[in-house]
Amino acid sequence: MDVGVFIPIGNNGWLISENAPQYMPTFELNKAIVQKAEGYGFDFALSMIKLRGFGGKTEFWEHNLESFTLMAGLAAVTSKIQLFATAATLTLPPAIVARMASTIDSISGGRFGVNLVTGWQKPEYSQMGLWPGDEFFGTRYQYLGEYAQVLRDLWATGRSDFKGEHFQMEDCRVSPKPQADMKIICAGSSDAGMAFSAQYADYNFCFGKGVNTPTAFAPAAERLQAACAKTGRHVTSCVLFMVIADETDEAARAKWEHYKAGADEEAIAWLGEQGAADKGADSNIRQMADPTSAVNINMGTLVGSYANVARMLDEIATVPGMQGVMLTFDDFLEGVEAFGQKIQPLMQSRRHVTALKESA
């Protein structure tokens, strides 16, 4: 099973809590995280894009780096780990993204890919006059399909004459082409999102569900496989989980309860308000805004001893259609270190990594 890290490009990572570590995003922090992850054999690192945060006492996600420029910098200071940047497709024409991606492909030696997002938080785009209207909620995957086709054309052939409803290319050119096959990621979970991933993506990200229920996301992976049966393409799932681990279950649970007790209710309320704006929202967005465990945006959470977290991660690997897991941590530097030293060596699904380290 592949393992990746969802790096903290926004302040405070993924915990909306006054009791969680409070920090600003910097290149140096993310460099330290990704270099440490690479040293422990992580397969990939991905950064999101966020253009406006949730406010509240913690000013959650009000402070963010930009994804492509961050990953370009990280490409220059890493050598093995795969890197993915996120394109907010309402802000960047596909031909520009194709050229930026080709540039980072050159910097990284073929270790780069792109995560495509349509945009669900209206204020991110309306603040700069780029929101196309609320009808976009219903047409965004048609838009994204055209966007992805232009990217595929340019990366494969260096030119595009695509003519669609949203994009019209006229002998559009990008050179040099990427040296490696450029992977596309999406995180759709609605029927339209799954259909898009089955047609255009290489991997589809989904949210884990619940606390210490590692395989509860399996229906999402099953739905993706059903969508792929219609397109004849092989697309696999990667699932997002937060790891809160310690020497004992009790110590890990105490940290989790402490974070929940300090939840930034004002920021969480903003998240719920924005998530409700799209009446036909992807279940990812509805899940993020659910008040049940909104302190970490309702991503799946693994709370326990290092041994029990390793066991639960191995359970994830048994789900059909799984490619890998993408992890966040309450404290990223400590979390990646603990994963590499105390969790990964106990995982059967990572024996190929630990065996290499043992023989080195």
UniProtKB/Swiss-Prot annotation:
Organism lineage string: Bacteria, Pseudomonadati, Pseudomonadota, Gammaproteobacteria, Pseudomonadales
Keyword set includes RNA-binding: no
Catalytic activity: uracil + FMNH2 + NADH + O2 = (Z)-3-ureidoacrylate + FMN + NAD(+) + H2O + H(+); thymine + FMNH2 + NADH + O2 = (Z)-2-methylureidoacrylate + FMN + NAD(+) + H2O + H(+)
Function: The FMN-N(5)-oxide reacts spontaneously with NADH to produce FMN. Requires the flavin reductase RutF to regenerate FMN in vivo.
Keywords associated with the record: Flavoprotein, FMN, Monooxygenase, NADP, Oxidoreductase
GO biological process, one term: uracil catabolic process
Gene field: rutA
Catalytic activity, EC: 1.14.99.46
Binding site for FMN: I49, K50, N115, E124, R140, Y141, S190
The protein's name: Pyrimidine monooxygenase RutA
Pfam families linked: Bac_luciferase
